């Protein structure tokens, strides 16, 4: 779903570091700051993010995990119809992931400012 080497619209800042045998989780390495793990729980279609080895979900990310982390939108379970994501380096240095479902784009996570 994400590809083996990089996400679409690769900026050079994000790469897929590891994919487990079943393809159920993805480790992204942000070369400047830290590591993010996106876990897709297939039976619920929810995404979980791991930052600095602390498991967090949706808008419940505590600010203590990383000083620069942003709280993601409440739209976290995007359903089964998810296309490949795009990632962008924003003007403020943060990384944004966008997922497209059937109707519109949601900003899933924007974490780790440079």
For the regions a protein language model found, what residue spans apply to each?
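Polar, enzyme-active/binding microenvironments
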Residues: 20, 42-43, 55, 63-69
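Glycine-rich, low-complexity segments
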Residues: 1-24
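Extracellular jelly-roll beta-sandwich "head" domains, especially the C-terminal globular C1q domain
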Residues: 1, 25, 48-60, 68-114
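Short, well-ordered beta-strand segments enriched in hydrophobic/aromatic residues
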Residues: 34-45
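N-terminal intrinsically disordered, low-complexity segments enriched in P/E/S/T
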Residues: 27-31
């Amino acid at each position: 779903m994400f590809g083996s080497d990089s996400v679409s619209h690769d900026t050079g800042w994000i790469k897929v570091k590891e994919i487990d045998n079943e393809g159920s989780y993805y480790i992204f390495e942000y070369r400047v700051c830290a590591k993010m793990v996106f876990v897709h729980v297939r039976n619920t279609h929810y995404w979980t993010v791991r930052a600095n080895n602390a498991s967090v979900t949706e808008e419940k990310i505590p600010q203590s995990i990383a000083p620069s982390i942003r709280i993601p939108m409440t739209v976290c379970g995007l359903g089964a119809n998810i296309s490949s994501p795009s990632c962008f380096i924003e003007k403020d240095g943060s990384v944004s992931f966008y997922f497209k479902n059937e109707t519109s784009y949601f900003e899933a996570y924007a974490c780790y400012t440079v």
